[in-house]
């Protein structure tokens, strides 16, 4: 109880308070941390409902208090009622409050899946409590694949559509103009929670194999737009790679725009890498992590119940050079027709495109 109270007070103190009532608009975007809808809808047609403590509207909160309504759901509903939108949108499919908004406000909701799902969500009662389908509802849900559709149809009522990655569908690469270079998508983390266990080891073996095959080796840093953490990330890899790599530091381009210029993409686990695979790029997944690692369930194919090892992926608890070589060689050396034939099933299993 005290922990929750402390968190609540910290939340209130950290937030930016605004007195001006939210702008009446066509759309309310729940969570302004990510907005892929901007490609379709003009920025001025959105009013953002912040939910991470970035901003609290004093007038909306005061209205809730006058009505003796004290929950987060009440605040969200009061905010939306004032804006009076035609549609409520979100790009975060794991925010459970969103699934109560349609019935609470009488306004239609649309959710898109942002990232790959894992079995951790399936097993956790935090996301979807028992019998959640009785009180969770979304009017429209745009999802990656049939496996995710089946999962959500058991947890939520609504209409579900398999479209692949919403944002990825806007970025189709010209495969004939791609550089024949290797890019490793970094999952570096400055936190001491073990998430980036062996990220540097995987990068090291990939760099050695790239060098052996006369291919340039690059790393797409996770924190290229955060200079403070970026320096730590570069140091992390430099300790083992000794500057034998290139950090891709273009801040103006999105990760999608950067990666579509490269032919060979590798990662330990990454929604971005799966999206590259769906678009026709060569993608390989090499995870070397203990089963106790908090991201172990993020391995390629985990949610889709694929084996731990396959043509272009492997999941290891310790270094296995032969396995790393096998995955690398399949991604790099398989001819085009065979690659398309062998990966077709797995592309559809993970992503529509």
Predicted regions and their residues:
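A donor-sugar binding/catalytic signature common to diverse glycosyltransferases
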Residues: 90-93, 113, 152-153, 252-298
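Catalytic binding pocket for nucleotide-activated donors in carbohydrate/polymer assembly enzymes
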Residues: 138, 156, 271-346
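Conserved catalytic-core segment of nucleotide-activated headgroup transferases in glycan assembly
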Residues: 40-44, 165-237
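Short hydrophobic segments within beta-strands
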Residues: 29-31, 112, 163, 184-185, ...
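Active-site and donor-binding regions of nucleotide-sugar-utilizing enzymes
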Residues: 4-19, 27-169, 272-273
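Nucleotide-activated donor-binding/catalytic signature segment of Leloir-type glycosyltransferases, i.e.
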Residues: 234-251
